[in-house]
């Protein structure tokens, strides 16, 4: 794919979705769907003309790829970031685990993507270790859960609650998750090892940022508390 608008988004999509395009040549089971290409082209035109677009499509059209592909092509060409908002966490994870890896493989262009969730979804190792309130570790509601969480925090990938493979009560998680009011920021002894700060760095670098509608509007109201500034 050429960059910097040497080729229009619509032409790139034609070369990707059409009966003679990249997907058809790469995937023996690929079935060309005119509705999918039409939807993707409509999204591309809306992006190129900076207009708002509302679309509705039936089951089996391939809606996710139809709006993701033109948005990603635009982001790559213009060296911008895009935020994909969803209504459910299920769709968030579907995009992260299925559609985006698929597009990264077959769009023939390099881009990165990251999941955006509220900061309360991340464990705070300082709070988990008792560092937020030294000498008050006995305030933890369930010592057994805390022991499990401390062991888990040593091996988990991103420090997300969704990564837990054992039950954790809401009360316990509330005691050890990241909350803005108790975050030590630059003074935190965890520094660059903080799960939340590492996630913010990944999101800042990502071409595609996937979150939900609630997080986006919460960020707008709180002056970009959760996401890095400037979603474009």
Annotate each language-model stretch with its function.
Residues 229-232:
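SF2 helicase catalytic motif II
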Residues 1-26, 79-207, 214-217:
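A substrate-engagement module of RecA-like helicase motors
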Residues 49-70:
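Walker A/P-loop
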Residues 49-53, 77-83:
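Short, surface-exposed connector motifs at secondary-structure boundaries
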Residues 217-223:
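Flexible, glycine/threonine-enriched loop-and-boundary segments that flank and lead into catalytic domains
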Residues 4-55:
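Conserved pre-motif I regulatory segment
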Residues 44-45, 65-78, 98-102:
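Walker A/P-loop NTP-binding motif
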